[in-house]
Amino acid sequence: MQEYLHLTGSEYIFLVEYHNGSENVMTGIQFCRFDITLEAVDDESSYIQIEKFRDDIVARYDILLSEDLGKNKLLYYTQEEFENADRYLAQQMGYINAKSYVLLNLKDNHGKAFGSILCISTDNEQINLLAVRELSIELENIFNNGGIE
């Protein structure tokens, strides 16, 4: 993913992977959870502690439940728009003073979301959306074909 930092114009790229990590004791209904499993950061930016995004509940994050994200739309936000769309996630990211955010779902072979890509730029007003789409296709192919060998 490091190569996509330059291609997308991002300083940060995160891979958000969805899973069912626990269930309701009374009903057995599973809670949809996620982990941020990969983080690519350019050499001049500080790391965001992705450990706090382990086995986290998706329902806490408005942006991950967005209808547009579910329709596989590529979502673009300025810092202010991102904070308005999901204040909790913006707080968790530590208000890194980004200029732009892009979020895109990753789908399996059956069209079901198994994760998302989150690209963040602190320098560029515009993230290269075509490169984000190319990264999503590459990651979908890896996951849908059994992973990295």
Question: What positions do the PLM features span?
Answer:
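Intrinsically disordered, low-complexity terminal regulatory regions
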Residues: M1-E44, L139, G146-E149
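Structural motif
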Residues: L5, A90-G94, N109
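Short acidic, S/G/P-rich loop/turn micro-motifs used as interaction or catalytic elements
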Residues: S22, F82, D123-I127
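Regulatory sensory and allosteric helical modules in signal-transduction proteins
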Residues: F31-I96
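Short, solvent-exposed, Trp/other aromatic-anchored flexible loops in extracytoplasmic proteins
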Residues: Y95-A98, L118
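Juxtadomain coupling helices with adjacent low-complexity linkers
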Residues: A113-E149
